[in-house]
């Protein structure tokens, strides 16, 4: 990889790390922030769900805009908007201001991921592209791991401090992008017209895909993976506050442990386990394991026990998503892009539904998010036993032919 490409990828990696650091930092803070404004679980769930909802809507739009206007201006807009949203969070004194800040940040930060990936595709050879995307993935993971711990620690004295710091880092990163990152898409290579984004057609395709097998079952699994994880993460701060009296620092470290365990699990265990047992078997076992861990979490009474049960939940959940993605890819040997797009859409739906559901049932009883989450994962396990083919059935067919 050329020196200029390495420099550009370093700037892009910093951009993604900053954005994901911001997302990670707010997770342990939100529960305490909204409680100080008199809100509870239902408001927290809706606040968290805004981000994946806006990303689902606006990421394709930003990708289309970058094809016409270039990558650099879209990336700059995303960083500027995200920095402003963090500043608004820090200045918020009422609940509605949090929702406005979250919405603005989600809409504009949705530009960063598709644009950085497109930048790498523009500026690297096919041989170097995988390495470049891998570096961006590592930066994303680093931001998500460090964010909760850093946010929880910075919020000990003031809940606003992490937001102001993130806003400042965003603006510094914006300067790096504006001053040192060249445009990767020449004017002659840009589209003259916008790509048509048709949400109704996308929803129709998602509905048709659900009726096919095994694709529909795998898409259901993709939904359940995200639903289970966000059901846990979204409400955990309020659960920890009500059950144990934990503050932002303890919640931040616990969520950081989730990120570390997930990264180690996916890096070390996913390959050997799926190679040995096959993706279908891994999906079935991890669905049941995640459900059991949800119930065990309710029995934990000390910090070591909480960490242990959360690790027991994180390991199978971390194995589940790559197994679902891999099996979806194998069962769609043609039209891979359609299959992966559907997988991402159902993943986003799970990230929207999980925190909303957890927040509303938390207001009924603080144990219900995890009990209901366990029940839903058990239902997924039963569905996988009945309808998910085993490893020996590997023949793939085109996605559209089945939907």
Model regions: which residues?
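Helix-breaking motifs and short loop linkers at transmembrane-helix boundaries and internal kinks
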Residues: 38, 70, 91-97, 108, ...
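Helix-loop-helix hairpin linking two adjacent transmembrane segments in secondary transporters
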Residues: 136-179
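Juxtamembrane intracellular "pre-TM" segments in multi-pass secondary transporters
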Residues: 1-5, 182-219, 402-403
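Conserved MFS/SLC helix-loop-helix module at the cytosolic interface between two early adjacent transmembrane helices
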Residues: 56-93
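C-terminal transmembrane helical hairpin of 12-TM major facilitator-type secondary transporters
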Residues: 280-324
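Cytoplasmic helix-loop-helix junction between adjacent transmembrane helices
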Residues: 101-142
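Helix-to-loop junctions at the C-terminal end of transmembrane segments
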Residues: 59-69, 265-279, 362
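Short amphipathic helix-loop junctions that connect adjacent transmembrane helices
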Residues: 28-42, 235-250
């Amino acid at each position: 990889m050329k020196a200029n490409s390495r420099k550009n990828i370093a700037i892009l990696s910093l951009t993604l790390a900053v954005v994901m650091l911001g997302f990670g930092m707010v997770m342990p803070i939100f529960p305490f922030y909204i409680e100080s404004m008199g809100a509870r679980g239902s408001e927290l769930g809706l606040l968290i769900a805004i981000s994946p909802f806006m990303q689902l809507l606006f990421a394709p739009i930003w990708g289309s805009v970058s094809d016409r206007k270039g990558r650099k201006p879209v990336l700059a807009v995303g960083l500027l908007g995200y920095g402003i949203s963090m500043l608004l969070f820090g200045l918020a004194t009422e609940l509605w201001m949090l929702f406005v800040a979250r919405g603005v940040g989600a809409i504009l930060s949705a530009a960063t991921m598709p644009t950085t990936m497109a930048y790498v595709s523009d500026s690297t050879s096919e041989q170097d592209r995988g390495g470049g995307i891998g570096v961006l993935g590592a930066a994303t993971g680093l931001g998500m791991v460090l964010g909760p711990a850093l946010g929880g620690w910075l919020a000990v004295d003031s809940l606003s401090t992490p937001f102001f710091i993130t806003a400042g880092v965003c603006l510094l990163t914006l300067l790096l992008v504006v001053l040192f990152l060249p445009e990767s898409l020449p004017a002659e290579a840009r589209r003259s017209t916008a790509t048509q984004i048709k949400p109704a057609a996308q929803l129709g395709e998602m509905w048709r895909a659900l009726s096919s097998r095994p694709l529909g079952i795998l898409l259901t699994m993709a939904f359940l993976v995200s639903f289970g994880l966000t059901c846990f993460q979204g409400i955990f701060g309020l659960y920890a506050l009500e059950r144990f009296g934990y503050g932002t620092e303890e919640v931040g470290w616990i969520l950081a442990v989730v990120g570390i365990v997930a990264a180690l699990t996916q890096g070390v265990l996913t390959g050997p386990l799926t190679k040995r047992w096959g993706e279908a078997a891994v999906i079935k076992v991890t669905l049941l394991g995640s459900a059991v861990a949800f119930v065990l979490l309710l029995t934990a009474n000390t910090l070591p026990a909480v960490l242990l049960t959360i690790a027991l939940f994180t390991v199978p959940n971390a194995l589940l998503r790559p197994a679902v993605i891999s099996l979806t890819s194998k069962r769609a040997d043609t039209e891979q892009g359609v299959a992966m797009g559907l997988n991402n859409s159902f993943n986003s739906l799970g990230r929207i539904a999980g925190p909303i559901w957890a927040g509303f049932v938390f207001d009924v009883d603080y144990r219900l998010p995890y009990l209901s989450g366990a029940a839903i994962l058990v239902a997924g396990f039963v569905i996988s036993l009945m309808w998910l083919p085993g490893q020996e059935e590997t023949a793939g067919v085109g996605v559209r032919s089945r939907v």
